[in-house]
From Swiss-Prot:
Top enzyme category: translocase
Keyword check for Repeat: no
Pfam family name, one: ABC_membrane
CDD domains attached to this UniProt entry: ABC_6TM_TAP2 (cd18590)
Marked site (Inter-subunit salt bridge with TAPBP) residue numbers: D16
Gene Ontology biological-process entries: antigen processing and presentation of endogenous peptide antigen via MHC class I; antigen processing and presentation of endogenous peptide antigen via MHC class I via ER pathway, TAP-dependent; antigen processing and presentation of endogenous peptide antigen via MHC class Ib via ER pathway, TAP-dependent; antigen processing and presentation of exogenous protein antigen via MHC class Ib, TAP-dependent; cytosol to endoplasmic reticulum transport; peptide antigen transport; positive regulation of T cell mediated cytotoxicity; protein transport
Protein name in the entry: Antigen peptide transporter 2
Residues of the ABC transporter domain: 467-701
Membrane topology, Lumenal segments: 1-6, 78-98, 169-186, 287-292, 395-407
Location relative to the cell: Endoplasmic reticulum membrane
Keyword annotations from UniProtKB, A to Z: Adaptive immunity, ATP-binding, Endoplasmic reticulum, Immunity, Magnesium, Membrane, Metal-binding, Nucleotide-binding, Peptide transport, Protein transport, Translocase, Transmembrane, Transmembrane helix, Transport
GO cellular component, one term: nuclear speck
Reaction catalysed by this enzyme: a peptide antigen(in) + ATP + H2O = a peptide antigen(out) + ADP + phosphate + H(+)
Length: 702
């Protein structure tokens, strides 16, 4: 472990010694004298060492600190020359200088490594996210391709706005020079006019630019959310058992928002800053090349500060994402099960859980804000030091007659702006990595292949409804070692009612889930009219095989929306016919708007029996050939049960009833008893076998 960690550094030292030996000989004689030769030497060292380490796959943190090692000496002598005001300052080459200069370079690298090791979060040094991030960025760009016209318009307005903003300080300097010298009314009026013109034009263009980027952001956000939601609904049930609801909600809300702002928001700031920096440096060079080169020294300082700050910032942002998702999960569980929470008097316990989750969020927010404040203080101190240095050199140039007072004012305004935009450019790198991190999670869901067979195409015009379980076994994906069903073999015949009974955990609901094609058997075959269930078209199958659960799930919307759920072009007459068959027409008729009455979230405005009737009507409106009732009549009165019995007698439908009551079993034509996933009994009703008699006796005693 230790040897593999030291290998890049040892390789760097040996390669650098060999290269410096070459530069000390005939190769070094080819280099020019002074600062140009020093910079060529540093650049040559950087390129060769970078290439060798890249070939050996040894870059990592060494590659991050390599520019400091190779360019620290040229930067030092360049700074001394710029501050002193002369480029003829004697310089030394690292290859031919004393060992002190080389040790100083490696000392700076060692100090930087120590700072990096202390301030960077664990694991950052070992990460190599470049290639992966580039792939994700390409996918984000591809996702934004439909909005290319709006992005082009936004970029046009961006260039116009930035150019206008860049010219304003130039004319401000002219005004100062006019007021400080011989006053020329025409020149003064011209300068003021152009200042106003560029101010108004840049403001208008900036508004158009921002509007175009925001419009693009909203379009991308909608597109990502639609694709993600569509992908989630196609996943297998095992995925939802393994993934928390709070995590899915977080991906659909916060992560998709981060993704949608990646291109519009970052492109807005990135391109604006880039164009602004280029334009500002152009005008700064016209004022004073010496001051311009001096201001360039702020770049490595800014990059170094961001290099330390960004990994910490990204790490804490990821922790905040997880903490917020957990806090949201507590709220959703408590509110979703409020009746249970209240019935057990657990309000204070849930509040305590939420306070703990919020406290974790607060600690992370405080840590994020503290680190950001410390970083901003360091940046402002560095900016102030650079400004003082430029002022000192600027005064020397004014005294030498090289720069006017107005020119120095323009330069200081430019320099303040360019520092801000350079920081924006460097900051955008970290922000883009943050958003790409969110995109990685979303893309993992978009790319996930559901553990489901390929959809079938069978959709016969008529279905008999004969169901055959042939030696069917099943285990849930999360517990493959624990079989739920073992070797089930039975047939459900059209025109018969089969009761499936057994103790809790025997596998009754799993049989219903397999019959709906929600899971696939791990062994054996499940046939419908002699064809494997997976061969049928998805929508066709779920029109022909329908389940009504003991606790029906309803959705916010009207009565009609819930009965006709999943159906297209379902007429009101069909809805009312199904409601009448389910004995739901009486309470629907008493509602204010009939079948168009809103029933609230999860059908909260209905009683339990009314919910079951709507769920039965939702199944009957499809006119299924196979109907599964998971004790779905437990909350119905005798009249409604009789109406359902009448519907059963119409047509040769196949019916499977998961029974928990003696009354339901007595009305069945066939009884199947499950125990520990095995079919214990498969005889006709009222044969009086021991297992079934024992079950009936237990029910009567209960």
């Amino acid at each position: 472990m230790a040897l593999s960690y030291l290998r890049p550094w040892v390789s760097l030292l040996l390669a650098d010694m060999a290269l410096l030996g070459l530069l000390q000989g005939s190769l070094g004689n080819l280099l020019p004298q002074g600062l140009p030769g020093l910079w060529i030497e540093g650049t040559l060292r950087l390129g060769v060492l970078w290439g060798l380490l890249k070939v050996g796959e040894l870059l990592g943190l060494v590659g991050t600190l390599l520019p400091l090692l190779c360019l620290a000496t040229p930067l030092f002598f360049s700074l001394r020359a710029l501050v002193g005001g002369t480029a003829s300052t004697s310089v030394v080459r690292v290859a031919s200088a004393s060992w002190g200069w080389l040790l100083a370079g490696y000392g700076a690298v060692a100090l930087s490594w120590a700072v990096w090791a202390v301030l960077s979060p664990a694991g950052v040094q070992e990460k190599e996210p470049g290639q992966e991030n580039r792939t994700l960025m390409k996918r984000l760009l591809k996702l934004s391709r439909p909005d290319l016209p709006f992005l082009i318009a936004a970029f046009f307005f961006l260039v116009v706005a930035v150019w206008g903003e860049t010219l304003i300080p130039r004319y401000s300097g002219r005004v100062i020079d006019i007021l400080g010298g011989d006053f020329d009314p025409d020149a003064f009026a011209s300068a003021i006019f152009f200042m106003c013109l560029f101010s108004v034009g840049s403001s208008f263009s900036a508004g158009c630019r921002g509007g175009s980027f925001l419009f693009t952001m909203s379009r991308i956000n909608l597109r990502i959310r639609e694709q993600l939601f569509s992908s989630l609904l196609r996943q297998d049930l095992g995925f939802f058992q393994e993934t928390k609801t709070g995590e899915l909600n977080s991906r659909l809300s916060s992560d998709t928002s981060l993704m949608s702002r990646w291109l519009p928001f970052n492109a807005n700031i990135l391109l604006r800053s880039l164009v602004k920096v280029v334009g500002l440096y152009f005008f700064m060079l016209q004022v004073s090349p010496r001051l311009t080169f001096l201001s360039l020294l702020d770049l490595p300082l800014t990059i170094a500060a961001e290099k330390v700050y960004n990994p910490r910032h990204q790490a804490v942002l990821k922790e905040i994402q997880d903490a917020v998702a957990k806090a949201g999960q507590v709220v959703r569980e408590a509110v979703g099960g409020l009746q249970t929470v209240r019935s057990f008097g657990a309000e204070e316990q849930e509040v305590s859980h939420y306070k703990e989750a919020l406290e974790r969020c607060r600690q992370l927010w405080w840590r994020r804000d503290l680190e950001k404040d410390v970083y901003l203080v360091i940046r402002r101190v560095m900016a102030l030091g650079m400004q003082v240095l430029i002022l000192n050199c600027g005064v020397q140039q004014i005294l030498a007659g090289e720069v006017t007072r107005g020119g120095l004012l323009s330069f200081l305004l430019y320099q303040e702006e360019v520092g801000q935009y350079v920081r924006n450019l460097v900051y955008m790198y970290g922000d883009m990595l943050s958003n790409v991190g969110a995109a990685e999670k979303v893309f993992s869901y978009l790319d996930r292949k559901p553990n489901l067979p390929q959809p079938g195409i069978l959709a016969p015009p008529w279905l008999e409804g004969r169901v055959e379980f042939q030696d069917v076994s099943f285990s849930y994906p999360r517990r493959p070692e624990k079989p739920v069903l073992q070797g089930l073999t039975f047939t459900l015949h059209p025109g018969t009612v089969t009761a499936l009974v057994g103790p809790n955990g025997s596998g009754k609901s799993t049989v219903a889930a397999l019959l709906q094609n929600l899971y696939q058997p791990t062994g054996g075959q499940l046939l419908l009219d002699g064809e494997p269930l997976t061969e049928y078209d998805h929508h066709y199958l779920h029109r022909q095989v329908v389940l009504v659960g003991q606790e029906p799930v309803l959705f916010s919307g009207s009565v009609k929306d819930n009965i006709a759920y999943g159906l297209r072009d379902c007429e009101d007459a069909q809805v009312m016919a199904a409601a009448q068959a389910a004995c739901a027409d009486d309470f629907i008729g008493e509602m204010t708007n009939g079948i168009n009455t809103e029933i609230g979230e999860k059908g909260g405005q209905l009683a339990v029996g009314q919910k079951q009737r709507l769920a039965i009507a939702r199944a009957l409106v499809r006119n299924p050939r196979v109907l599964i009732l998971d004790e779905a009549t437990s909350a119905l009165d005798a009249q409604c049960e009789q109406a359902l019995q009448n519907w059963r007698s119409q047509g040769d439908r196949t019916m499977l009833v998961i029974a928990h009551r003696l009354h339901t079993v007595q009305n069945a034509d066939q009884v199947l008893v499950l125990k520990q996933g095995r079919l214990v009994e498969h005889d006709q009703l009222r044969d009086g076998q021991d297992v079934y008699a024992h079950l009936v006796q237990q029910r009567l005693e209960a």
